[in-house]
Amino acid sequence: MRGFGSDSSQASGEEAKCPVNHKTRELWLHQARAAQSASTSAAPALPQSVQVAPASQPSQPSSYSSSSWSSWLRIPFFSQQSQSANSTQQAQPPKLSAPLLDETRVISSIPRTPDATPSACPVNHEVETGASPTGHWVYPSEKQFFEAMRRKGYDPHAADMKTVVPIHNAVNERAWAEILQWEAPYVEPVSKGGCGGPRLHSFSGLGTQHMSPRARINTLLGYQAPFDRHDWVIDRCGKKIEYVIDFYAGRSDGGNAGKLNFYLDVRPKLNSWEGFKMRALRAVGLS
């Protein structure tokens, strides 16, 4: 979930000014490795593409189960190559070179505010090389993700990027889909003078040391703590709306070996009258 923009090097003094949690990538890498570990114990399967879809009710506190704004991600991961692979390929000696990292950057479906100005602390807390001509945020490539983690003192494996980057992209897309559901009742179409819909203005990863009030209360009640938190600022036709997103690692069942479940709890912050109003109207079914 870290950084949509490019992540090239920057002076340490400037980087220290940004309120970014450098452990965020490591958190997601840990989740990815856990899924890969589970997949190695399962029967070999053909590679599957990343899928993002709502699943059954989560095994979280009752307040989560009844939350219409919460959703699951069930992401299948690549298992080892099928045992029926060509024998001549299996006989080839292992390559000594490290896996090549893809430099392709995927354009997200998330529009960004056009007035985001460059600064020592960019709105996405990464060093940017500019927005896509489409006006949407751009996801980092495998190489950018890998180099950013290594530069910040972690020990990433190039092979992990094949898993981490799809997780990063899929979870961002799901979070944005949830925000669009929240925003739908308040957005006017362009034909009626609207601005065309909300845009993502900025975001930041706060990690687990800054738990949201809901997450803290449920953790005190004995429920699972989130493994990450992000705050997103949405531009709704000139009005800034803040959202909080808690990320939970879902419990996998016996039939989903090699798959990693994510539970996203997305809602407006209660730090403004607009946030209170949106959550109250949703609670009584009026939005």
Swiss-Prot record:
Family assignment from sequence similarity: Belongs to the cytochrome c-type heme lyase family.
Function: Probable lyase that catalyzes the covalent linking of the heme group to the cytochrome C apoprotein to produce the mature functional cytochrome.
Major enzyme class: lyase
Name of the protein in question: Putative holocytochrome-c1 synthase
Transmembrane helix recorded as keyword: no
Keyword Heme attached: yes
Entry EC number(s): 4.4.1.17
Segments of this protein annotated with the region Disordered: 1-63, 81-100
Organism expressing this protein natively: Chaetomium thermophilum (strain DSM 1495 / CBS 144.50 / IMI 039719) (Thermochaetoides thermophila)
